[in-house]
C-alpha cells in the first residue's frame, strides 16, 4: 500500500463506498484529492521538476436539450499538473451522471458548466472540449511512438514496487530516443481495482537499459496509487536514477466508469502532441 493510503484527506471520498446516483445537475458531487499527498512522498517542493497535464476522456456525457431530447457527446478535459488537486474519478463519474436528466440551453452551456465546476475542484483553470460523435468518429486509433520494450525473454518473480531496479540503468552512449511499454499495471489507491495502461518515455541522455526499465515498470503491478501519482513517480524515479537531460512520460490508461485518464509529465513540454486513443481505449 502507498504510505499515504490512510491520509485523512481520503477518508471522505465516495470511492469504495455504496453511493446513490443523482440524475439532476449537482457540482457538489466532485471531490478533490490534494496532489501534495504523493508529492510529499516523492520529496517534491513547490518548484516542480516537471510540467504537464492530466487529459481525461469523457465517454458517457449526456444531458437533455430544452425540449427534453437527450444529447450525447464525448468530452476532453485537460487539468494542469500545477493544480492543487487532482479530481477523484468516481466523483467525476457521479458528477457527469448528474447531467443525465437536466435540461441545458445549448452545448456551449454544458461546456461552460464543465469548465467552471472542474476548475473549482482542481483549484486551477481546466480546458474542456465537448465533441459530437461525428467529430470523434474521425479520430484514429494510434500506437505509441518509439521502440516497444515488452518482448524481452526475461524471467520475473517479484511484483512488488522497487525503484532501485533503475539503479545503474543508464550507463550507455548519449542518445535521444523514445521507448514504450504496454505492460504498465497498478491498482487503485482505495479499492485495489486494477488499472491498465501503456506508457511512453522520451528522453535525451545516457542510453537506458531495456531490461532494467521493463523490470521497473512491471514492479508497479501490485502497487497502489492513482494514475497521476504513478506517472509522477515514474518521472521522478527516472530523473533520479538515470539523470537524463530531458524527459517526458506519457501514460494512457484504459477506461473505467466511462472515463479514461492520460497523465503527461515533461521536463520541457506542457502538453502532449496528441490526444488520440490507443488500441485498448
UniProtKB/Swiss-Prot annotation:
It catalyses: 7-aminomethyl-7-carbaguanine + 2 NADP(+) = 7-cyano-7-deazaguanine + 2 NADPH + 3 H(+). One of its GO terms (cellular component) is cytosol. Its main location: cytoplasm. Its EC number is 1.7.1.13. It is found in: Cytoplasm. Residues 262-281 are annotated as: Disordered. Substrate binds at residues 87-89, 227-228. GO terms for molecular function: preQ1 synthase activity. Pathway: tRNA modification; tRNA-queuosine biosynthesis. One of its GO terms (biological process) is tRNA modification. NADPH binds at residues 89-90, 256-257. It comes from the Bacteria. The active site is at residues 188, 195. Residues 264-281 have a biased composition (Polar residues). The keyword Repeat does not apply. Keywords: Cytoplasm, NADP, Oxidoreductase, Queuosine biosynthesis. Catalyzes the NADPH-dependent reduction of 7-cyano-7-deazaguanine (preQ0) to 7-aminomethyl-7-deazaguanine (preQ1). Homodimer. Belongs to the GTP cyclohydrolase I family. QueF type 2 subfamily. This is NADPH-dependent 7-cyano-7-deazaguanine reductase. The gene is queF.
Amino acid at each position: 500500500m502507498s504510505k499515504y493510503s490512510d491520509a485523512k484527506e481520503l477518508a471522505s471520498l465516495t470511492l469504495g463506498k455504496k453511493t446513490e446516483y443523482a440524475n439532476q445537475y449537482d457540482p457538489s458531487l466532485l471531490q478533490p484529492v490534494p496532489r501534495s499527498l504523493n508529492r510529499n512522498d516523492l520529496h517534491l517542493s513547490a518548484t516542480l521538476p516537471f510540467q504537464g497535464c492530466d487529459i481525461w476522456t469523457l465517454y458517457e456525457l449526456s444531458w437533455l436539450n430544452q425540449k427534453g431530447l437527450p444529447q450525447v457527446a464525448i468530452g476532453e478535459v485537460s487539468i494542469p499538473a500545477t493544480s492543487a488537486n487532482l479530481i477523484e474519478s468516481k466523483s467525476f463519474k457521479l458528477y457527469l451522471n448528474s447531467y443525465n436528466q437536466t435540461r441545458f440551453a445549448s452545448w456551449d452551456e454544458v461546456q461552460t458548466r464543465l469548465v467552471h465546476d472542474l476548475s473549482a475542484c482542481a483549484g486551477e483553470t481546466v480546458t474542456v472540449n465537448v465533441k459530437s460523435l461525428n467529430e470523434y468518429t474521425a479520430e484514429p486509433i494510434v500506437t505509441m511512438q518509439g521502440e516497444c520494450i515488452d518482448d524481452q525473454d526475461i524471467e520475473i518473480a517479484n511484483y512488488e514496487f522497487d525503484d532501485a531496479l533503475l539503479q545503474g540503468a543508464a550507463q550507455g552512449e548519449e542518445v535521444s530516443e523514445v521507448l514504450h511499454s504496454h505492460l504498465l499495471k497498478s491498482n487503485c489507491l482505495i479499492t485495489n481495482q486494477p488499472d491498465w495502461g501503456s506508457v511512453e518515455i522520451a528522453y535525451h541522455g545516457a542510453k537506458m537499459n531495456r531490461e532494467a526499465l521493463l523490470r521497473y515498470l512491471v514492479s508497479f503491478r501490485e502497487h497502489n496509487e492513482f494514475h497521476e501519482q504513478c506517472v509522477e513517480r515514474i518521472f521522478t524515479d527516472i530523473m533520479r536514477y538515470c539523470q537524463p537531460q530531458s524527459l517526458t512520460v506519457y501514460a494512457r490508461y484504459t477506461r473505467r466508469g466511462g472515463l479514461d485518464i492520460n497523465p503527461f509529465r515533461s521536463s520541457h513540454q506542457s502538453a502532449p502532441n496528441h490526444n488520440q486513443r490507443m488500441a485498448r481505449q
